[in-house]
């Protein structure tokens, strides 16, 4: 009968986390904690490493669908759901941290931030950012998610959140899943409608941004509509 002993430098991930702090753990160890168990064919550490080997970077995990996660060796439906929930929670925490009282100094700065959030979305998302008198973001609201042809903005809904959060200005942002950021006639129409509605309420439409993974279009920079 053999007894198994662990050396100080080979503590199980949960024990290492408790002893040394979460920052001390490798990506493999963190993922192993989330996966919890292995299979008959592979240990949880082997599965974690296989998952990481399938990624070009950790950000790929955020982009993966439930089906894509399940296609990875050793990842069943339950593990895939749990992983996606954890990834989304981490994303929301990060978004909240960067959102809190962030001052908007330029369209380029804001576009870069929203590219990270919307650039890889496969459906069109229309988002409104609401600002105070110091041009600090006080609220972010997704107005619409859908196909390009169905993405019709309703000024009344956009202004509802502006009034609710006592915003003095707002920025519209939406993505083009195709990757091309040139505005459509519908984009121009929506921009005009929202600007007119904002003016009636004494709210400033600072910009309307169109973003893709690698590019952006600013109505304020490129047109005279704003």
From Swiss-Prot:
Zn(2+) binds at residues 174, 176, 187. Pfam families: RadC (PF04002), UPF0758_N (PF20582). Keywords: Hydrolase, Metal-binding, Metalloprotease, Protease, Zinc. GO terms for molecular function: metal ion binding; metallopeptidase activity. Residues 103-225 form the MPN domain. PROSITE patterns: MPN, UPF0758. Gene3D superfamilies: Cytidine Deaminase, domain 2 (3.40.140.10). Disulfide bonds: none annotated. Disruption phenotype: Mutants show normal uptake and processing of transforming DNA. They also display normal sensitivity to DNA-damaging agents. GO terms for biological process: proteolysis. Signal peptide: none annotated. Belongs to the UPF0758 family. This is UPF0758 protein spr0996.
């Amino acid at each position: 009968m053999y007894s198994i002993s662990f050396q100080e430098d080979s503590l199980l991930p949960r024990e290492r986390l408790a002893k040394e702090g979460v920052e001390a753990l490798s990506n493999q160890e963190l993922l192993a904690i989330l996966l919890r168990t292995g299979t008959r064919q592979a240990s949880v550490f082997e599965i974690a490493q296989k998952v990481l080997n399938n990624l070009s970077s950790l950000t790929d995990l955020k982009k993966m669908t439930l089906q894509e996660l399940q296609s990875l060796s050793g990842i069943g439906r339950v593990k895939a759901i749990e992983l996606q929930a954890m990834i989304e929670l981490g994303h929301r925490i990060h978004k909240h941290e960067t959102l809190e009282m962030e001052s908007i100094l330029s369209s380029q700065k804001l576009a870069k931030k929203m590219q990270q959030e919307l650039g890889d979305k496969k459906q069109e998302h229309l988002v409104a950012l609401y600002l105070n008198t110091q041009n600090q973001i006080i609220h972010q609201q997704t107005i619409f998610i859908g196909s390009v042809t169905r993405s019709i903005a309703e000024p009344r809904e956009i202004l509802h959140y502006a009034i609710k959060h006592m915003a003095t200005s707002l920025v519209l942002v939406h993505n083009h899943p195709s990757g091309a950021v040139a505005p459509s006639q519908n984009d121009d129409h929506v921009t005009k409608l929202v600007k007119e509605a904002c003016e009636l309420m004494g709210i400033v439409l600072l910009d309307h941004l169109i973003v893709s993974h690698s590019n952006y279009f600013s109505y304020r920079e490129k047109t005279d509509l704003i």
